[in-house]
Amino acid sequence: MIIFSGGTGTPKLLDGLKEILPEEELTVVVNTAEDLWVSGNLISPDLDTVLYLFSDQIDRKRWWGIENDTFGTYERMKELGIEEGLKLGDRDRATHIIRSNIIRDGASLTDSTVKLSSLFGIKANILPMSDDPVSTYIETAEGIMHFQDFWIGKRGEPDVRGVDIRGVSEASISPKVLEAFEKEENILIGPSNPITSIGPIISLPGMRELLKKKKVVAVSPIIGNAPVSGPAGKLMPACGIEVSSMGVAEYYQDFLDVFVFDERDRADEFAFERLGCHASRADTLMTSTEKSKELAEIVVQAF
């Protein structure tokens, strides 16, 4: 199975999937459009979250970073008047240093991810969506800013006028992702932000055409008219997409076969059928590993 993932939502579902399926059977294609260089090192927030999940390092209270990490380097930089913007943990920073050194030596982002997976003892196949640089910028009332500046620096507060995924039309799907598509028929679109997490992956040239040839199941990150987490509630309207499960399904319509949405959502199942996909209700909140496992079982049965 191939799973498309961002840094929130989908990792919780992955937590359930790895409880019911051998990790070797999971290929996770991860968004890289939120990556940025900080203090000379490449930060890949979504990749790091997935790597830390599969290596049992993740801070499960925040669902990002490493559990019990320290912040000595960040605090020392701050004391010296250097503001990094992102509060990076010391052990987390080691991941970034290893990745960046591999890339500086001429290897790809995929190569660095495969190496980190090996160092962490991960059995799942974790891959960046592309080896080419792609960056999401948010057009706001306060100006245009990188997604991390919008979401972390500004806490997602500015009014959003548009979203620009820079470099995506020139980027290529990574060779190892294409290789995985040759072997797998089942694709899961996880419940991550459809605009800034899943959007960059499916916007890569040729990706939607590949998906049309596969069995695609998607899980909604929206309940009612609000996202479970993250800034999708502001980003979707700015892109002309309704903040609802229906809005998400319509965004995926050209390749979607099965759509799983929350049991508390009042959306009409038959409305999804009219889009050409089968609809299924489930508890999508994933408030515990057991809940994640229950949703994972429903999703696997949908294929």
From Swiss-Prot:
An example Gene Ontology molecular-function term: magnesium ion binding
Pfam assignment, any one: CofD
Keywords noted in UniProt: Magnesium, Transferase
Keyword Transferase (UniProt): yes
Biological-process GO terms, alphabetical: F420-0 metabolic process
Pathway, per record: Cofactor biosynthesis; coenzyme F420 biosynthesis
EC number, as in UniProt: 2.7.8.28
Source organism, top-level taxon: Archaea
Catalytic activity: (2S)-lactyl-2-diphospho-5'-guanosine + 7,8-didemethyl-8-hydroxy-5-deazariboflavin = oxidized coenzyme F420-0 + GMP + H(+)
Binding residues annotated for 7,8-didemethyl-8-hydroxy-5-deazariboflavin, in chain numbering: D48, K87
InterPro entries with a match to the protein in the record: CofD, CofD-like_dom_sf, FbiA/CofD
Cofactor needs: Mg(2+)
Quaternary state and interactors: Homodimer.
Function in brief: Catalyzes the transfer of the 2-phospholactate moiety from (2S)-lactyl-2-diphospho-5'-guanosine to 7,8-didemethyl-8-hydroxy-5-deazariboflavin (FO) with the formation of oxidized coenzyme F420-0 and GMP.
Family from the record: Belongs to the CofD family.
Entry-linked PANTHER family: 2-PHOSPHO-L-LACTATE TRANSFERASE
Protein name: 2-phospho-L-lactate transferase
Species, as recorded: Methanosarcina mazei (strain ATCC BAA-159 / DSM 3647 / Goe1 / Go1 / JCM 11833 / OCM 88) (Methanosarcina frisia)
Gene assigned in the entry: cofD
